[in-house]
A protein has these predicted regions:
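Catalytic active-site module of serine/aspartate enzymes centered on a nucleophile-bearing elbow/loop
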Residues: 93-126
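Residue-level preference for short coil/turn positions at secondary-structure junctions
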Residues: 64-65, 126
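Short beta-strand/loop motif that positions the catalytic acidic residue
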Residues: 64, 70-72
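Acidic catalytic loop of the alpha/beta-hydrolase fold
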Residues: 75-79, 104
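Residue-level signal for the nucleotide or nucleotide-sugar donor/cofactor binding architecture
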Residues: 40, 79-82, 109
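Short alpha-helix in the alpha/beta-hydrolase fold that links the catalytic acid
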Residues: 57, 66, 80-89
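Hydrophobic "lid"/C-terminal helical patch
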Residues: 16, 49-52, 87, 114, ...
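Conserved alpha/beta-hydrolase catalytic His-Asp/Glu region
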Residues: 5-63
């Protein structure tokens, strides 16, 4: 990405869009999301990816002190439901919600359902 600049970033974004947004997301929505992601500064995106590659938050999960809602999809390309559940169970006061689909950006692809689940979760704690 660094050597190719913005055109390489846009090509990478488009090539990886299916896993990010899943197979059911509308083409025009995916095109907009690709444009939006590709408008990020290349050095910002590269720095973000480098930070993710070396990140291991596993040891910190038990230190999360607030109620936590974890949302994933059945076919997320990032981790299986079982792997996500194993992480979620290490977070005190947490709950896992699994949505149908195969995206790993559920907040984008299933925004209305994520909002509904989040509001219900927040109201449970009040």
């Amino acid at each position: 990405l660094e050597l190719g600049g913005a055109p390489a970033l846009e090509a990478w974004v488009r090539a990886t869009m299916d896993g990010r947004l899943g197979s059911a997301f509308p083409d025009d929505g995916a095109a907009w999301w690709a444009w939006y992601m590709a408008s990020t500064r290349v050095d910002t995106e590269v720095g973000f990816i480098r930070g993710l590659l070396g990140a291991d938050i596993g040891p910190d999960l038990a230190r999360i002190a607030c109620p936590t809602l974890v949302i994933t999809t059945q076919g997320s390309g990032l981790s299986t439901v079982e792997e996500t559940r194993a992480w979620q169970q290490r977070i005190p006061q947490s709950r896992l919600e699994v949505l149908p689909g195969d995206s790993y950006h559920a907040a984008v692809t299933d925004a209305a359902e994520c909002v509904r689940l989040t509001l219900a979760f927040l109201h449970e704690g009040t």
